[in-house]
């Protein structure tokens, strides 16, 4: 029962994160030394954000399949085999690490967007950070990262539950 709740939480967190990423598009202009330069940012123009979206889609699909599987096991009142629990443990660990890696990559890119363009290396020319100019994009990316980290936490708890279930199968016979 707890596993089903964790799987549904992962799916919900991923859906919120994906919707934040898919709607994070913004266009603006930067004024430098009298010139107006148009800038725009979208999730698919940054490799870390692309990685985040691809991982979120994969993990969301995996969590949904596991949700359906756990629901069927619960409905049939069946007990999963040790082999099945081992496979689930391995897959859950891979998913938890993947989600954490994607969140870390996106957080690094987001941090660069906030401060990466503070200076061009000249004393008198200052360029504002991307997030000052494109604040809507950065706010939605931050929301996506937060919900991805929540999904990573739920995946980590699911791994712990898998270990507990595996321990029970060894002690129960």
UniProtKB/Swiss-Prot annotation:
Parts of the chain on the Extracellular side: 23-48, 106-140
Subunit-level organization: Homodimer and heterodimers.
Top-rank taxon: Eukaryota
Organism whose genome encodes this protein: Pteridium aquilinum subsp. aquilinum (Bracken fern)
Family: Belongs to the Casparian strip membrane proteins (CASP) family.
UniProt key word Acetylation: no
Localization per record: Cell membrane
Main location: membrane
Record-annotated membrane-spanning stretches: 2-22, 49-69, 85-105, 141-161
UniProtKB keywords: Cell membrane, Glycoprotein, Membrane, Transmembrane, Transmembrane helix
Protein name: CASP-like protein 3A1
InterPro entries: CASP/CASPL, CASP_dom
């Amino acid at each position: 029962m707890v596993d089903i709740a964790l799987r549904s939480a992962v799916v919900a967190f991923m859906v919120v994160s994906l919707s934040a990423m898919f709607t994070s598009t913004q266009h603006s202009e930067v004024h430098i030394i009298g010139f107006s330069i148009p800038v725009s940012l979208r999730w698919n123009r940054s490799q870390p954000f692309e990685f985040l979206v691809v991982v979120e889609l994969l993990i969301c699909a995996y969590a949904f399949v596991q949700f359906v599987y756990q629901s069927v096991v619960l409905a049939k009142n069946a007990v999963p085999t040790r082999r099945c629990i081992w496979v689930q443990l391995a897959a859950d660990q891979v998913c938890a690490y993947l989600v954490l890696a994607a969140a870390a990559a996106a957080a690094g890119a987001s941090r660069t967007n906030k401060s990466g363009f503070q200076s061009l290396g000249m004393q008198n020319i200052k360029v504002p950070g991307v997030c000052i100019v494109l604040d809507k994009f950065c706010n939605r990316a931050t929301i996506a990262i937060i919900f991805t980290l929540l999904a990573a936490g739920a995946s980590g708890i699911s791994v712990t539950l898998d270990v507990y279930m595996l321990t029970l199968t060894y002690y129960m016979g």
